[in-house]
């Protein structure tokens, strides 16, 4: 059921991109957006891990406490060993990326190594490895890529509105209402779809992570510390299209950022974990 729901949401996201292309350029724009969606999905499949790691200037490691924890989890649960990266960020956070369990990467900030105990770090990495195990990372990467393209088209539409038209519509008068809907509705709709995909999979990864590390309290304690640290010191220069990939929401502030978070409430995640029996 969760797989069918995710497929449906990804279809909605792709159709939204096609609609945005149609609003910008008529039938030709819709066809271009459809081709772009196919190319972007293929690109996300093959290169999403490299793109996201490069975006946050990740450094691959083959030793140290983070590598040791990931290696222990993989050996204990017979999982393929992913590449391990450290991000030069003081704010504690982590994410996973890649196209499948054999071609995956996990990344954590320098700050997380200063804040969490080894058990808590194991809980966080178990959560990320659960994403890897269930291929959530590929779905999240594709969703982030398409949502970013929709936001880009909406930004272009703002300029089109300023200069009086679509520039490539089949009619001369254009469609001001369609342009307005694209500017306002498309980014919001893309964010809502991302939120729906991310929230259900975060709860599942929490459960899976607890199973992988053997103690749900490891992750519960880590989430409590991570949420507090990110509230006090938000991560700078976060790309909104990739925010859903992190274990806790790196975007902070009021308005839409808090109302339409791609992450479930941390308090609820902690409550569910603490109510789990030791596995």
Swiss-Prot record:
Residue spans crossing the bilayer: 6-26, 28-48, 137-157, 177-197
GO MF terms held by the record: metalloendopeptidase activity; zinc ion binding
Cofactor details (free text): Binds 1 zinc ion per subunit.
GO CC terms in record: plasma membrane
Cofactor section: Zn(2+)
Cystines in this chain: none
Primary localization class, coarse: membrane
Active-site feature positions: 128
Membrane topology, as annotated: Multi-pass membrane protein
EC number: 3.4.24.-
Superkingdom of origin: Bacteria
EC primary class: hydrolase
List of residues binding Zn(2+): 127, 131, 202
Keyword annotations of the record: Cell inner membrane, Cell membrane, Hydrolase, Membrane, Metal-binding, Metalloprotease, Protease, Transmembrane, Transmembrane helix, Zinc
Alphabetical list of InterPro entries matching this protein: HtpX_protease (IPR050083), Pept_M48_protease_HtpX (IPR022919), Peptidase_M48 (IPR001915)
Pfam family, one: Peptidase_M48
Alphabetized Gene3D superfamilies for the sequence: Metalloproteases ('zincins'), catalytic domain (3.30.2010.10)
Subcellular location as annotated: Cell inner membrane
Gene Ontology BP terms: proteolysis
Family to which the UniProt record says this protein belongs: Belongs to the peptidase M48B family.
Name of the protein described by the UniProt record: Protease HtpX homolog
Organism name: Syntrophotalea carbinolica (strain DSM 2380 / NBRC 103641 / GraBd1) (Pelobacter carbinolicus)
Gene encoding the protein: htpX
């Amino acid at each position: 059921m969760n797989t069918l729901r995710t497929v449906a949401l990804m279809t909605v996201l792709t159709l939204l991109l096609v609609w945005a292309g149609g609003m910008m350029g008529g039938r030709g724009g819709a066809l271009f957006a459809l081709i772009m969606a196919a190319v972007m999905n293929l690109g996300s499949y093959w290169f999403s891990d490299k793109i996201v790691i490069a975006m946050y200037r990740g450094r691959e490691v083959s030793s140290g406490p983070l590598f040791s924890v990931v290696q222990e989890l993989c050996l204990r649960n017979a999982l393929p060993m992913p590449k391990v990266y450290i991000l030069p960020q003081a704010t504690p956070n982590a994410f996973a990326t890649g196209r499948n369990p054999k071609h995956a990467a996990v990344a954590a900030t320098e700050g997380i190594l200063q804040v969490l105990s080894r058990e808590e770090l194991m809980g966080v990495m178990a959560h990320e490895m659960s994403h890897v195990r269930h291929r959530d990372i590929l779905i999240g990467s594709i969703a982030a890529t398409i949502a970013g393209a929709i936001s880009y088209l909406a930004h272009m539409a703002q300029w089109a509105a300023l200069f009086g038209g679509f520039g490539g519509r089949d009619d001369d008068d254009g469609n001001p209402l369609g342009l307005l809907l694209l500017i306002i509705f498309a980014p919001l709709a893309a964010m809502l779809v991302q939120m729906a995909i991310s929230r259900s999979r975060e709860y599942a990864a929490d459960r899976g992570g607890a199973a992988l590390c053997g103690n749900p309290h490891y992750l519960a304690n880590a989430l409590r510390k991570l949420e507090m640290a990110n509230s006090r010191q938000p991560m700078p220069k976060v790309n909104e299209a990739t925010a859903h990939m992190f274990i806790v929401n790196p975007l902070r502030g009021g308005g839409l950022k808090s109302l339409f978070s791609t992450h479930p409430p941390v308090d609820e995640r902690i409550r569910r974990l603490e109510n789990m029996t030791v596995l």
